[in-house]
Every structure is written in structure tokens, then in C-alpha cells.
């Protein structure tokens, strides 16, 4: 085969020189021939560009530029050679000259168009093609149009008043109407009245579809709101709301079977831990101990090791995790050693319950006793806490690491709300009968009214608000964070890690708005329909709460676990029978306050004085006897008492810090000392 002769110019020389410098594989496999795919693609793009240009110009400018023109009302074109249609430069057929779309598209917009001959049925139906003046390409058999457009109501556009559920009935109605339209008689009803008559005639059929819709809505409500039951006849919506809350609490409370399965899991984990370390003790704390847990809540455990043999190092955590996994008690194991409280997180393969194990953290045990004491004092605490926990759990705001509120923080919020409620403190309202009102006011307080930037919450000593600035808990970059003083440890801020408090606040505010609008709607419905229809009203809590399929499946799984391994059922312990601590009656030493005694010149003490003070007797050089009083309070006690804010001045907190200065040592007489001790006792 002969070689192609190439002109030896400068450009070809540079091209050949560059090819020599390229790597050998690239020179071997290089193909100078154009790709078939690219060429086809270019042709396709070229053809589509002409069609797109025609669409953009609305068939006017493109046709003006072309020589073959189609005249209106004439069968001849200027280009007789191309009788089949108009083609562009690429040979693509744009359209046929006899195509009505070109005729009407090329027409003068000021010249009225002749109405094409279309079927009478299409005119009666009022199809859009008639209104546009463009017939269909594949039309039915054409008949001359009678000049009775107004009588037949040809310009009437009908709307579909039926729902998607009644598609079959709509198609049947269309066929019946088409048959009736074909019949022409002198007594035929005009089109306008026929359409209106059809609308009223289908009222009975629509009632059937409404029944279907109501039945489906009831089925949906029973699935998402399994707690809903018929209400008792009440005229006040607050009482109806109270019934709905009782129904929800009764449904969401764990059954004895579920509680027994969790207790069995605790015993199995306890045996495994003692098998590894016989000298430690395993305790349960958290919501399981206080009976405030939801069906999908975690199980909180703590391992307390003896002083002589400490357990809880990183190595011990990994050893225990491996041991539990080896015994098939743990799956999806996570050992978190970098947190403030190192824990082991895992899931029980049998019950699918999430478990958290911590080491040497006795504060959780004290917390359980304090929460039990609050539940004994405030009957509305348990239902409100359970509803708020489920409300935040649905929105992923109940986990601290996600920026939400912990269960303990929610308990403290509800306790503070009940402690400082004006009507509850005066006894003008009972908690047991007003769960709905209290829930609304809780959402309104912490969603719309509470001043997070300056106010902190304390629940010990009857509950009070304090200034975050005076306490030293105000963060300049995040002043909106919630501050809750731990009644067990006054130096601990329970909600300091809840970074997403703005989302929590907005969620509370939206919940209040939704419930308020729902209650107003129910009140107006009672006025319209009467009190007897109250029992059929939907759930009020369904506006903010629901139970998803995962919760129902988990509860069914727990019931299956109990049936496979039945154990003797124990009745749930009543709140009054729980071990508890009342922080209002407890000595301050037991809740984390440490008393520091200052050094004195004398060792003699007065044992008859109050427990909060200790008086050291000293004799000065002048011979007079004076008493030196030393206020034995910790920094936590000082900050909580001195920075105590008046609840009535919650939103107008003074920035003056002069009140924070309290004299620690002063000379006084014995009579003055007794009077000051009485004042201090009143404050606590």
C-alpha cells in the first residue's frame, strides 16, 4: 500500500516533532481518525439546533428567512421542487406545507382565522384546542359546526370536582354524558343548566366518597394515634384535652411484661460483670429507676468499684466490652473514652434495648432519689415529663450530644415550672385535674416568655430563679443557653452542653401554637355541633405527637421476648413506695455543700448554736469578750443564695453586682448573733 504524501511545511514539522516527544504507548494507541460517536453526536446537535431555533422564534422569523413559503389559502408554494415539505440546510424536514400548524402560525395575527370543522361533541366538551383555534392532527370524523355555540355552551371549561378516589365513577359519568349529548331533542336541557344539574346530582355520590375519606382518616388516626379513645361528654375543651393526655400516658407507660424483660436484661448483664470482676457492684439509674422511660429509652447502668481495686480505666472499658460481646450480650459496641463521662454503648441482641454503662459515677444514684422525691410532691410531674420527652424525641432533641435536653434537664424544667406556678402555689388550681392547661402553659413559658439570656433555674429550697451573670454561668458568645443548677451538686450546670437550645425553644413555641389553634377549632365545633359530638372528636395531642411504626414494632418484639422467656410478673412500684430524697428537707451537707471551718485562736466552740454556724470564742487584749462569726458556706451556697432573683422581676434583672458582696467576718454581740442565725434559717 502506498504512503500518503504529506506537504513538508513548518506546521506539519512541529506536529511530527511533538508526536515524537510523546510517550511510546500514547503514540502507539493514538488514533487520528475522528470518532464515529462524536460525528453522530454533532449531526444530532446540528439537527436539533434548527428545530430549537424554530421553536424559540415561534415559527415566524425562521419561516421568513427561508425561501419556500406557504401562503394562506393557496395550495402552491414558491418552491415547487420540494412538494413534501420545507427542509432546512441540514436536510431536516421542518413541517409539511399542508400542515395546519404552519398555516395558522404564519397567519397575520390581526386577521381573524376561520374556525376549522370539528366534531360537535368536541365543541360541546369545550376542549382547549377549540379555544386556541388549532385542530388536532388525529381528529375524529369532522362534521359541519352549527352556529349554536352559545346554546351548547362551547366556551365552558369544566372542572373536576371529584377526588382521586372516584376515578371509576368519573369515567362512567363521562360516558353517560357523552351518550346524552349525542341525543338532540327539543326538550334537551341547555348546557349550563346541565352542568350545574350534574354537579348537584352528584351530591349523593360525593357523600359516599366522603364516607370513604372519613374511614381512611380514622384508620390513619388509629395507626398514628393508638392511644386515642372516645372522650367523655365535656363542654370545656380543657377537660377534653386532659382526657387525651390521660389516654396517652396510659398507652405509653411500659407494661409489666416490658418492665420484666428489662429487669431480666439487667440481671443477665450483672451476672456477666460479676463473672469478670467479682468485687464490683452494678446499679441501675436514670429513667428506668424513676419509671419515666419511654418504650425505646436507653438502659443506664453504673459500675461502682471498691477503693482498693479501682475499675474504670480505658483498658477496663475495652476488656468489659470484649467480654460482653464474647457472651453475645452486646452488639454494635461503642467504647467512648473521650467524653466527660466515659461510657460503653451497646445493643442487646435479644431484646434490641440500648444500654449505657458508666464507671464510678454515684451522682446518678442520688439524682434518682431526688427525682423520686419530686414525683411524690408534684402529681403532674410524671405525665408532663413523659409528654415532653416524647415530643422532643420525635424531633431528635432529647439527646445532649445532638444539642437537645437530657431527661434530667426536662425534669428540672417541669419541677421549676410547677414550683413557681402562681395558681398552684396558692392552691387555686389542682394539678391532678389540669394536665392540659399545665402542658400549654409549660410550652408557652419556655417557648415564648422565658428570658434565657439572663435567668437561671434552681429547684432546691422551694425553687427560684437566679442571675446567670452573678453566678458566673453567662457565656458572652452563647448567652441564650439554658442554665439549671443541679440540686445534687450546686457547681454543676445540668444543661450546659445543650447547644441546640434555640431549636428546643422554637419547638416549644410551635407546639403551643398548634395546640392552641386546635383547641380553638374544637371549641367552635362544640358550639356548632353540640356537646353530644364530643366523643367522636379526634385526638388533640395528635397535632404534636404520634407513634411511629418503629415504636409499635419494638413493643411487639418485647412482648415476644417475654413470651419466649416468661418470668413472674411484678406490679409496677407506686410512686409513693419509691426511695426518695426531699431536697427541701434534706440537710445541706447531703446535697453536695461542703462546710469549711476557718482557723481560730481558740479551740472552744459553742455547741448550742445553729448547725449552719459555728462561733469561736476569743479573748482580746482589752478583756472584753467578743464573738467571731464565720459563715461556713461553700461557693455554691453563696452563689445560690446571694444571686437569688425575684420571680416577679424575672425579665428586669439589675446588672448591679454590689449586692453580691456579703461580709464573711464581723464582730457582733451574742444577741445579734442569734437574730442573724434566725434570718439565715428562714432563707433556707
From Swiss-Prot:
Region (Disordered) residue spans: 1-52, 64-127, 161-219, 623-684
Ligand binding (ATP): 364, 389, 407-408, 492, 496
Top-rank taxon: Eukaryota
UniProt xrefs under SUPFAM superfamilies: Nucleotidyltransferase, PAP/OAS1 substrate-binding domain
Biased composition (Polar residues): 628-655
Principal place of residence: nucleus
Residue ranges with Acidic residues bias: 656-672
Reaction(s) catalysed (UniProt annotation): RNA(n) + ATP = RNA(n)-3'-adenine ribonucleotide + diphosphate
Binding residue positions for Mg(2+): 298, 300
Swiss-Prot/TrEMBL keywords: ATP-binding, Magnesium, Manganese, Metal-binding, mRNA processing, Nucleotide-binding, Nucleotidyltransferase, Nucleus, RNA-binding, Transferase
Cofactor: Mg(2+); Mn(2+)
Function: Required for 3' polyadenylation of the 5.8S and 25S rRNAs as a prelude to their degradation in the exosome. Involved in the nucleolar organization to ensure faithful chromosome segregation during mitosis.
Name this polypeptide is given: Poly(A) RNA polymerase cid14
Organism of this sequence: Schizosaccharomyces pombe (strain 972 / ATCC 24843) (Fission yeast)
Amino acid at each position: 500500500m502506498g504512503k500518503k504524501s504529506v506537504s513538508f511545511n513548518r506546521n506539519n514539522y512541529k506536529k511530527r516533532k511533538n508526536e515524537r516527544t510523546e510517550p511510546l504507548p500514547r503514540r502507539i494507541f493514538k488514533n487520528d481518525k475522528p470518532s464515529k460517536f462524536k460525528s453522530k453526536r454533532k449531526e444530532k446537535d446540528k439537527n436539533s439546533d434548527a428545530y430549537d431555533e424554530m421553536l424559540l422564534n415561534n415559527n415566524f422569523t425562521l419561516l421568513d428567512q427561508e425561501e419556500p413559503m406557504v401562503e394562506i389559502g393557496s395550495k402552491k408554494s414558491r418552491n415547487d421542487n420540494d412538494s413534501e415539505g420545507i427542509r432546512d440546510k441540514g436536510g431536516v424536514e421542518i413541517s409539511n406545507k399542508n400542515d395546519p400548524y404552519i398555516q395558522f402560525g404564519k397567519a397575520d395575527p390581526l386577521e381573524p382565522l376561520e374556525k376549522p370543522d370539528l366534531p360537535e361533541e368536541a365543541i360541546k366538551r369545550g376542549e382547549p384546542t377549540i379555544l386556541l383555534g388549532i385542530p388536532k392532527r388525529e381528529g375524529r370524523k369532522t362534521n359541519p359546526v352549527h352556529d349554536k355555540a352559545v346554546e351548547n355552551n362551547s366556551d365552558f371549561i369544566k372542572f373536576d370536582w371529584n377526588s382521586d378516589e372516584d376515578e371509576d365513577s368519573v369515567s362512567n359519568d363521562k360516558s353517560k354524558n357523552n351518550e346524552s349529548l349525542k341525543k338532540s331533542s327539543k326538550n334537551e336541557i341547555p348546557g349550563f343548566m346541565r352542568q350545574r344539574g350534574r354537579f348537584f346530582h352528584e351530591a349523593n355520590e360525593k357523600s359516599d366518597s366522603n364516607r370513604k375519606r372519613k374511614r381512611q382518616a380514622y384508620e390513619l388516626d388509629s395507626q398514628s394515634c393508638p392511644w386515642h379513645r372516645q372522650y367523655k361528654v365535656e363542654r370545656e375543651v380543657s377537660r377534653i384535652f386532659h382526657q387525651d393526655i390521660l389516654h396517652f400516658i396510659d398507652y405509653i407507660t411500659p407494661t409489666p411484661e416490658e418492665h420484666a424483660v428489662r429487669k431480666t436484661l439487667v440481671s443477665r448483664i450483672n451476672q456477666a460483670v460479676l463473672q469478670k470482676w467479682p468485687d464490683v457492684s452494678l446499679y441501675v439509674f436514670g429513667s428506668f429507676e424513676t419509671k419515666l422511660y419511654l418504650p425505646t429509652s436507653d438502659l443506664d447502668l453504673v459500675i461502682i468499684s471498691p477503693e482498693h481495686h479501682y475499675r474504670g480505666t480505658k483498658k477496663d472499658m475495652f476488656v468489659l466490652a470484649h467480654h460482653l460481646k464474647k457472651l453475645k450480650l452486646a452488639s454494635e459496641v461503642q467504647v467512648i473514652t473521650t467524653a466527660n463521662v466515659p461510657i460503653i454503648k451497646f445493643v442487646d441482641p435479644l431484646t434490641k434495648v440500648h444500654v449505657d454503662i458508666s464507671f464510678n459515677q454515684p451522682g446518678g444514684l442520688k439524682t434518682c432519689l431526688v427525682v423520686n422525691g419530686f414525683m411524690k410532691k408534684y402529681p403532674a410531674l410524671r405525665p408532663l415529663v413523659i409528654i415532653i420527652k416524647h415530643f422532643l424525641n420525635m424531633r431528635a432533641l432529647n439527646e445532649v450530644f445532638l444539642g437537645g435536653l437530657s431527661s434530667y434537664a426536662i425534669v428540672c424544667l417541669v419541677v421549676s415550672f410547677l414550683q413557681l406556678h402562681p395558681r398552684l402555689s396558692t392552691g387555686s388550681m389542682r394539678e391532678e385535674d389540669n394536665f392540659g392547661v399545665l402542658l400549654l402553659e409549660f410550652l408557652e413559658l419556655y417557648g415564648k416568655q422565658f428570658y434565657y439570656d439572663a435567668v437561671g433555674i434552681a429547684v432546691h429550697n422551694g425553687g427560684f430563679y437566679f442571675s446567670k451573670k452573678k453566678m458566673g454561668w453567662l457565656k458572652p458568645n452563647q448567652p441564650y443557653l439554658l442554665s439549671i443548677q443541679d440540686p445534687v451538686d450546686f457547681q454543676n450546670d445540668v444543661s450546659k452542653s445543650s447547644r441546640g437550645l434555640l431549636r428546643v425553644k422554637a419547638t416549644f413555641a410551635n407546639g403551643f401554637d398548634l395546640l392552641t389553634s386546635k383547641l380553638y377549632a374544637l371549641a367552635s365545633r362544640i358550639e356548632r355541633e353540640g356537646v353530644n359530638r364530643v366523643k367522636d372528636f379526634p385526638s388533640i395531642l395528635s397535632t404534636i405527637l404520634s407513634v411511629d411504626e418503629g415504636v409499635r414494632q419494638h413493643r411487639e418484639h418485647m412482648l415476644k421476648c417475654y413470651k419466649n422467656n416468661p418470668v413472674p410478673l411484678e406490679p409496677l412500684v407506686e410512686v409513693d413506695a419509691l426511695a426518695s430524697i426531699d431536697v427541701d428537707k434534706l440537710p445541706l451537707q447531703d446535697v453536695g455543700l461542703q462546710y469549711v471551718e476557718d482557723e481560730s485562736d481558740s479551740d472552744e466552740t459553742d455547741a448550742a448554736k445553729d448547725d449552719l454556724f459555728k462561733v469561736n470564742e476569743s479573748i482580746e487584749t482589752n478583756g472584753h469578750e467578743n464573738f467571731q462569726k464565720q459563715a461556713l458556706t461553700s461557693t455554691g451556697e453563696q452563689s445560690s443564695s446571694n444571686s437569688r432573683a425575684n420571680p416577679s422581676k424575672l425579665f428586669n434583672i439589675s446588672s448591679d453586682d454590689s449586692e453580691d458582696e456579703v461580709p464573711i467576718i464581723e464582730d457582733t454581740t451574742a444577741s445579734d448573733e442569734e437574730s442573724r442565725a434566725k434570718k439565715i434559717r428562714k432563707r433556707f
